[in-house]
Curated annotation (Swiss-Prot):
InterPro entries: DNA-dir_RNA_pol_omega, Pol_omega/Rpo6/RPB6, RPB6/omega-like_sf. The lineage of its organism: Bacteria, Pseudomonadati, Pseudomonadota, Gammaproteobacteria, Pseudomonadales. This is DNA-directed RNA polymerase subunit omega. GO terms for biological process: DNA-templated transcription. GO terms for molecular function: DNA binding; DNA-directed RNA polymerase activity. It comes from the Bacteria. Promotes RNA polymerase assembly. Latches the N- and C-terminal regions of the beta' subunit thereby facilitating its interaction with the beta and alpha subunits. Keywords: DNA-directed RNA polymerase, Nucleotidyltransferase, Transcription, Transferase. Belongs to the RNA polymerase subunit omega family. Its EC number is 2.7.7.6.
Amino acid sequence: MARVTVEDCLEHVDNRFELVMLSTKRARQLATGGKEPRVAWENDKPTVVALREIAEGIVTNEFIAAEEIVTEDPVFAAFEDENNEAV
């Protein structure tokens, strides 16, 4: 198992706060969203896999945004549009 450090991740992310948000979103995708990891799982927890993906430059904010757009539920989006209409 390769050890991942914050410094490795910060080479691809602007600051620690953005790193926390990005790794949290990606770990949640891996754990509950049914997304496939882009690196070998190696019996790690989703958080570690997410950090390894970030450290290798595979996962970025743009990657997460694209994944969220693709997985958006069209039924929920239609319901949300109906509720946002002016009365």
